[in-house]
From Swiss-Prot:
Upper classification of the organism: Eukaryota, Metazoa, Chordata, Craniata, Vertebrata
Organism annotation: Cricetulus longicaudatus (Long-tailed dwarf hamster)
Name used for this protein in its record: Galectin-3
Main location: cytoplasm
Coiled-coil stretches noted in the UniProt entry, renumbered to this chain: none
Keywords in alphabetical order: Acetylation, Cytoplasm, Differentiation, Disulfide bond, IgE-binding protein, Immunity, Innate immunity, Lectin, mRNA processing, mRNA splicing, Nucleus, Phosphoprotein, Repeat, Secreted, Spliceosome
PANTHER family (UniProt xref): GALECTIN (PTHR11346), GALECTIN-3 (PTHR11346:SF26)
């Protein structure tokens, strides 16, 4: 791949203990309390001693908290704006960076749901979508939009001629391009799901339920113009948020 990452680096369970800066193996959660890109568990990026903030003497302490390793805020381990949230980013054990600096909506979201991507997408942006597939579902649709064009159409179909298939495509000037079809199908009616879309310089990567699923090469090269994602289909949507890794 153009970015220098091998598929072994990207796949969960590759056996690589430090897959070149990924937050744990691709599609998986980092270790307990790990901040994306940190070299030590609980460490903020760029720290030398384990858990210590630059210039701080006590290891593991963030400026100001009473408990070692606590993030500033009303509750230990809670991200600002999410007081008392159990398992909140970034310091709770096993927490995945789903909310990131953007914050994540809470409660059920209205579908179709449009997620603004201010400034467009860019390499190392990770969008995490969580929800539950409805019983007797027909399809799920994720569209990365550039105005009226669809840069990346991700469309799991539960019953296309009695078969389950995932269709990916691009729509430009009201014309669909060549379909790319994927037979691996990790979704189940009535079951919860987590979709992660990682933007790279020349492609999107998609993981579902912590396992790498597919890669889709960019057909629209100006990523900054892709500034919105639309989520629709037969799902109950609980969260959708971007972060940088």
């Amino acid at each position: 791949m153009a970015d220098g990452f091998s598929l072994n680096d990207a796949l969960a369970g590759s056996g690589n203990p430090n897959p070149q800066g990924w937050p744990g193996a691709w599609g998986n959660q980092p270790g307990a309390g790990g901040y994306p890109g940190a070299s030590y568990p609980g460490a903020y990026p760029g720290q030398a001693p384990p858990g210590a903030y630059p210039g701080q003497a006590p290891p593991g302490a963030y400026p100001g908290p009473t408990a070692p390793g606590a993030y500033p805020g009303p509750a230990p381990g809670a991200y600002p704006g999410q007081p008392g949230a159990s398992g909140a980013y970034p310091s709770a054990p096993g927490a995945y960076p789903a909310a990131g600096p953007y914050g994540a909506p809470t409660g059920a979201l209205t579908v179709p749901y449009k997620l603004p991507l201010a400034g467009g997408v860019m390499p190392r942006m990770l969008i995490t979508i969580m929800g539950t597939v409805k019983p007797n579902a027909n399809r799920i649709i994720l569209n990365f939009l550039r105005g009226n064009d669809i840069a990346f159409h991700f469309n799991p179909r539960f019953n296309e001629n009695n078969r389950r298939v995932i269709v990916c495509n691009t729509k430009q000037d009201n014309n669909w391009g060549r379909e790319e079809r994927q037979s691996a199908f990790p979704f189940e009616s009535g079951r919860p799901f987590k979709i992660q879309v990682l933007v790279e310089a020349d492609h999107f990567k998609v993981a579902v339920n912590d396992a790498h699923l597919l890669q889709y090469n960019h057909r629209m090269k100006n990523l900054r113009e892709i500034n919105q994602m639309e989520i629709s289909g037969d799902i109950t949507l609980t969260s959708a948020a971007p972060t940088m890794i």
